Design a protein with these regions (language model features):
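Short, basic, helix/turn surface patches
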Residues: 1, 178-180
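A structured beta-alpha segment of the ubiquitous adenosine-cofactor-binding alpha/beta core
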Residues: 1-21, 25
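ALDH superfamily catalytic-core signature
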Residues: 25-178
Length: 180
């Protein structure tokens, strides 16, 4: 338990570790690789972070279970609570289906109910830590600075029940590939 940097360094430099696998940010991967070389620990790194979901026109050939699963996949994978490091953080959508596809996605996102995860009426809980909440808040600010158009959400969620909780509104921004 603790900060990823401290724990990661300890694990990657420990003599009992026989293999390192990491998925995440490039600069962190470079650091892990440097540490792993100290004991010549085999390493597998998947770096980059901004892996997209790609949606082509064919997903809308029928308004069926497959189409619903495509929407659900985008919505649910994009709205974890900080526990999934392989989470796709953007979607590339074929232009001809963009409007009707996003209309359905936004409807689904608006149906997400934030709150205590022990309450079965809620569908999304808080972020897993204060640091994760702050990291996401920083990205929300960057998106605005980079000129992204907020389609839904885009802010810290304040609840009267838990005003200091680590909740973030489910958010979708529209932008371009050069955005951070």
């Amino acid at each position: 338990n603790g900060a990823g940097g401290k724990i990661g360094k300890h694990l990657v430099t420990h003599r009992d570790v026989k293999k390192v696998a990491f998925t995440g940010e490039t600069s962190t991967g470079q650091e892990i690789m440097r540490y792993a070389t100290e004991n010549i620990i085999p390493s597998t790194l998947e770096l980059g972070g901004k892996s997209p979901n790609v949606f082509f026109k064919s997903i809308m050939d029928a308004d069926d279970e497959f189409f619903d699963k495509a929407i659900e996949g985008l919505v649910l994978f994009a709205f974890n609570s900080g526990e999934v490091c392989t989470c796709p953080s953007r979607a590339l959508i074929e232009e001809s289906i963009y409007e009707p596809f996003m209309k359905r996605v936004i409807e689904r996102v608006k149906a997400i109910k934030l709150g205590n995860p022990l309450d079965t009426e809620n569908t999304m809980g808080a972020q897993n830590s204060f640091n994760q909440k702050e990291k996401i808040a920083k990205y929300l600010k960057i998106a605005k600075e980079d000129g992204a158009e907020c389609l839904v959400g885009g802010d810290i969620y304040h609840s009267s029940i838990n005003p200091d909780g680590f909740y973030i509104e489910p958010t979708i921004y529209k932008g371009h590939n050069k955005m951070r």
